[in-house]
């Protein structure tokens, strides 16, 4: 389940980042962020185990006080709603591209051009969003996230299949993009392997790229419900650590593979999202299936974002008690509100990505360091405490 908390469309956006970072430096950055993510998760595991708390906000109150808990609950609620809206909009966008690619609608005589305006029509938006939302509502009513373990296989399978499709088609798309964009005398059209200078432009691409990497690994609040499944098992702490190592290693490896494969497909002028690329004439059945699989992986990632939201709201208003009535009302209201906002304000993704990135760094990197420091029983001047705080604080500065 840990791996599925990370996967979404983000994994297919790294090619555009590589044009600024240089592929080599982006891969190095991806590996470093993966290592830091693993370390911050281990801080959460240690604090959770020592204090026998498997809820992020309750653990925060126990160690850092009620005011910090209120702050964390607010962050989790805002962050979760922002991510859920993004998932809604992305699922709808992918569904539209899937339908377009299958040519179900006769308005698409040209397979290469996706007419986004058609998908902004109310008579198409309304039934599709309602259908997606109802499906997500019934999934989110589940109380135990570990019952969705199978979704990890769907998420990993969707990513692996999509990367294989991109890899197999890489040669043809590379040749086509080189013919279109490469000019020998113009260095700006050359492949950027290791030039990090482009990232430090007025558009702050370096910080955008680093923030995207940190946000892609923001699974800290969603991982606590996963820990519940290990709590009463023999050697539960050891199993939690193994699951964390495996999950982060799997995610980081797939992220790095995605960077390399998607970048080499079109290193001259890549798409913002590699699976959105234009088909090279006629139907691309393999990529059409990939879009469907990625849509499913996003749908199954949705409950992993909703569960910590439900816990935070319950902790704030019902002392952590989640009755059946409360569960049903909150689930349907939350899902339909996110759906309504995502459908009406279709350009909201850009704003939500900034909100999510800003909140993520505090919630997932700074707070875990503080939890560990106060749990250790040693002063903040102790070398381990100082090193953990400095490391996580540097992550906050970079990701901001």
Ranges and model annotations:
Residues 13-23, 145-146:
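Short, hydrophobic transmembrane alpha-helix segments
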Residues 31-64, 79:
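Juxtamembrane transmembrane-helix boundary signature
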Residues 10, 132-137, 334-339:
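Hydrophobic, membrane-inserted alpha-helices
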Residues 47, 53-73, 86-128, 151-155, ...:
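Membrane-interfacial loop- and helix-cap regions that link adjacent transmembrane helices
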Residues 135-147, 153:
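Intramembrane alpha-helical segments
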Residues 21-35, 156, 242, 355-359:
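Loop-to-helix transition at the N-terminal end of transmembrane alpha-helices
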Residues 1-16, 38-42:
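Membrane-interface "cap" regions at the ends of multi-pass membrane proteins
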Residues 17, 138-142, 340-346:
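Hydrophobic alpha-helical transmembrane segments
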């Amino acid at each position: 389940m840990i791996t599925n908390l990370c996967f979404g469309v983000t994994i297919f956006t790294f090619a555009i980042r590589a044009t600024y970072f240089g592929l080599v430096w982006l891969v190095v950055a991806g590996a470093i962020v993966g290592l830091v993510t693993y370390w911050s998760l281990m801080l959460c595991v240690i604090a959770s185990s020592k204090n026998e708390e498997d809820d992020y906000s309750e653990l925060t109150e126990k160690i850092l006080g009620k005011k910090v808990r209120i702050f964390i609950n607010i962050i989790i609620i805002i962050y979760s709603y922002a991510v859920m809206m993004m998932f809604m909009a992305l699922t709808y966008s992918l569904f539209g591209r899937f339908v377009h690619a299958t040519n179900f609608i006769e308005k698409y005589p040209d397979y290469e051009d996706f007419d986004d305006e058609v998908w902004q029509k109310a008579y198409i938006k309304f039934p599709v969003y309602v259908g997606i939302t109802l499906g997500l509502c019934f999934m989110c009513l589940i109380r135990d996230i570990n019952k969705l373990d199978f979704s990890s296989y769907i998420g990993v399978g969707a990513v692996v299949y999509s990367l294989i499709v991109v890899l197999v088609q890489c040669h043809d798309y590379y040749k086509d993009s080189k013919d279109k964009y490469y000019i020998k005398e113009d260095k700006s059209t050359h492949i950027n392997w290791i030039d990090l200078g482009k990232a430090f432009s007025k558009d702050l691409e370096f910080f955008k790229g680093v923030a995207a990497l940190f946000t892609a690994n923001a699974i800290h609040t969603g991982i606590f419900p996963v820990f519940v499944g290990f709590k009463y098992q023999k050697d539960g702490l050891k199993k939690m650590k193994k699951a964390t190592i495996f999950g982060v290693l799997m995610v980081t490896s797939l992220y790095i593979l995605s960077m390399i494969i998607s970048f080499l497909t079109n290193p001259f002028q890549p798409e913002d999202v590699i699976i959105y690329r234009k088909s090279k004439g006629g139907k691309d059945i393999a990529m059409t299936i990939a879009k469907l699989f990625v849509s499913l992986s996003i749908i199954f990632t949705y409950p992993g974002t909703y569960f910590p939201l439900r816990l935070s709201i319950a902790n704030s208003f019902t002392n952590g008690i989640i009755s059946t009535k409360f569960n049903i009302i909150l689930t349907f209201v939350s899902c339909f509100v996110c759906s309504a906002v995502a459908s009406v304000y279709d350009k909201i993704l850009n704003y939500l990505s900034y909100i999510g990135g800003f909140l993520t760094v505090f919630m997932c990197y700074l707070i875990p360091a503080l939890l560990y420091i106060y749990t250790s029983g040693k002063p903040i001047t102790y070398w381990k405490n100082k090193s953990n705080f400095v490391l996580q604080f540097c992550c906050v500065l970079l990701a901001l």
